[in-house]
């Protein structure tokens, strides 16, 4: 019973995150030093600022990052990722946490973190992990996957001195609420570069107190298409992890775990609706301001989408509880 429950929980997680199995362990873990040196020497990303388009993350690296992000609660956490480059794809093989000071709005790396980083990478090479640092990750608890002004500055600095480098952002709170990993991978454009107009990206809810920071910097970076993979080795390690944690999947409830987050979402939504109502009210007394009206209606439409998203997540959490109650609590005695 325990084995079947563990396997079902693991399969559900893999399907929700579109986990793909690598064709061969050797294919994905083989490190060609000569090929990597040739790529570093050619530096194709300097000729095309949109060169890297894809980001592949191993299942084990993904789990380590999500578990680290979740352990931070409402505080931001930070870590480093090891990997390699294959054409236009950045492959993240492993990740590790950094001993940094975190707040609810930023993470601050001190000298000890940089010493730890250098020692970890050096020790990894001694045990046969030849991949170099390929990026950094940090968490945005409850406010989505995007780069703030500080994040953009940090990533620009990294790309200037440590190319190739990618920034990954994880929202552990929304991951629990939606049941799917909420993660984004980003690269910044050089200063002064104006990117071509792109189509609308996937909509995500941004809290009112973060909208300004999001809007000011959203044109300074672009998102990579993220996918996940697992090898036979990953599968064995995942089975060991799931044997330990699968019970938590059944015993926990997103309605209880994320009660504060849901309350915050409703409060944020009420502020957005009040702001939209005030703008629409002012617009009714001002003639000839069609642009103003359109902006107000656009804000109202976004607030409506946020409301639908919060409602759907709450319904999913409630349905999950009802199903578990039917399965485990209502035993028919014949």
Swiss-Prot record:
**Protein name stated in the entry:** COP9 signalosome complex subunit 5
As annotated in the record, motif JAMM motif runs over 138-151
* GO terms under cellular component: chromatin; COP9 signalosome; cytoplasm; cytosol; eukaryotic translation initiation factor 3 complex; nucleoplasm; nucleus; perinuclear region of cytoplasm
Gene3D superfamilies, sorted? Cytidine Deaminase, domain 2
For the modification N-acetylalanine, the affected residues are 2
- Organism of provenance: Homo sapiens (Human)
User: What is recorded about the domains?
Assistant: The JAMM motif is essential for the protease activity of the CSN complex resulting in deneddylation of cullins. It constitutes the catalytic center of the complex.
Q: Which residues bind Zn(2+)?
A: 138, 140, 151
Q: Which gene encodes it?
A: COPS5
Has the keyword DNA-binding been applied to this entry? Answer: no
């Amino acid at each position: 019973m325990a084995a079947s429950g563990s396997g079902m929980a693991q399969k559900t997680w893999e399907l929700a995150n579109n986990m793909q199995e690598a064709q061969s362990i050797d294919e994905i873990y083989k490190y060609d030093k000569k090929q990597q040196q040739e790529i570093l020497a050619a530096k194709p990303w300097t000729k095309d600022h949109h060169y890297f388009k894809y980001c592949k993350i191993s299942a084990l690296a993904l789990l380590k990052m999500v578990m680290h992000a979740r352990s931070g609660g409402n505080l931001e956490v930070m870590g480093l990722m090891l990997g390699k480059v294959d054409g236009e794809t950045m492959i993240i093989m492993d990740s590790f946490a950094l001993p940094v000071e975190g707040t609810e709005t930023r993470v601050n790396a001190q000298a000890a973190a940089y010493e730890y980083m250098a020692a970890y990478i050096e020790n990894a090479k001694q045990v046969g992990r030849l991949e170099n640092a390929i990026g950094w990750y940090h968490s945005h608890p409850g406010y989505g996957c995007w780069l703030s002004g500080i994040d953009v500055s940090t990533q620009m600095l990294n790309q200037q001195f440590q190319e190739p480098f990618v920034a990954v952002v994880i929202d552990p709170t929304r991951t629990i609420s939606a049941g799917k990993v909420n993660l984004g991978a980003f690269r910044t454009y050089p200063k002064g570069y104006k990117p071509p107009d792109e189509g609308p990206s996937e909509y995500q809810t941004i809290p009112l107190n973060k909208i300004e920071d999001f809007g000011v910097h959203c044109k300074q970076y672009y998102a990579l298409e993220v996918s996940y993979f697992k090898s036979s080795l990953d599968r064995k390690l995942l089975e060991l992890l799931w044997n330990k944690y699968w019970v938590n999947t059944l015993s926990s409830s997103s309605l209880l775990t994320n009660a504060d987050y849901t309350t915050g979402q409703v409060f944020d939504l009420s502020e957005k609706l009040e702001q939209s109502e005030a703008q629409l009210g002012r617009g009714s007394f001002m003639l000839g301001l069609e642009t103003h009206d359109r902006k107000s209606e656009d804000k109202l439409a976004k607030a409506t989408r946020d409301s639908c998203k919060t409602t759907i997540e709450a319904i999913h959490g409630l349905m999950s509880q009802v199903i578990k109650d039917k399965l485990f609590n209502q035993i028919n005695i014949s």
